Amino acid sequence: SPAELTGGRGLYRWAKSVGAFEGPAQRARGSVEQVAALSIAMTADQKRMLEVAGRYPLLSESELALMLRQRVWTVRRSLERSIAQGLIEAVVGPVTKGLTRSDVRYVMTELGLRLVAARERIPARRYAEHGPFAATIGAGERGRLQTLIRQFEHTVGANRFFLDCLAQSEAGGPSLREWQSVSDTTIRFESNGVRRTIRPDGTGKVVHDGVERRFWLEWDRGTERIAVLLEKLDRYAAYYRSHTFSDGSVPQLLVVCPTPHREDVVWRAAEAVF
């Protein structure tokens, strides 16, 4: 009754009665009640983890612990509960040899996205299209997250680069202060009357000696054909030509290559278009 739901204890009992603490609140009447019940049942650690999993898809358990600055066992407990509630989903890469914990990576589900969208008071569909999170949407193969999963090794590699930067950040030394993942990094611009788009593998901000430097990451695994590489670099060149930057504000393009030979290939391609 309304009287019973007055105050925190009543809401807590209601969320428990619809099964929000053990699962995805299956006894809730409709999706709005389901999201409301899960929001009450979630812990503060779960809410933080859900946002990280949405912003940075395909992180492992230990990588989530690094991002959240928590112990692995704390993250594991939050993951187990969130998976049971249908907010987080485990993904195993296509080249994985076994089902060890390090092979399993995690993504936000559609239900998790609906919960975050409701908290921001934004329709879920609009949030899925324009928000900073990538999540499993329906059963199709379209969408930001589905693309990242298809490019599993590439996505995981780019994530690892930023995570290594984060782990090696030192007080007084170079420090990674900002990271926008590939799912949250799209630059649209106009060059010579033509609309163009750049999609780096992430954006970072490094601070050293009080100076901030932004960069775009291109994680090059050496598998891209030269024609594709040239076309990608040409978009960056067009962006730089069409913009005026104040001192120190120009974002640097950082291409990480797997071998010295591939680095030579990238340099020659850059010289051809810049």
What residues fall within each predicted segment?
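Short amphipathic alpha-helical interaction segments
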Residues: 69-84
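Short acidic, hydrophobic short linear motifs in intrinsically disordered regions
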Residues: 55-67
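Pre-recognition alpha-helix immediately N-terminal to the DNA-recognition helix
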Residues: 44-51
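Short, solvent-exposed loop/turn segments at secondary-structure junctions
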Residues: 56-59, 95, 113, 186, ...
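Accessory beta->alpha helical hairpin/"wing" motif in late/C-terminal subdomains of nucleic-acid enzymes
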Residues: 92-131
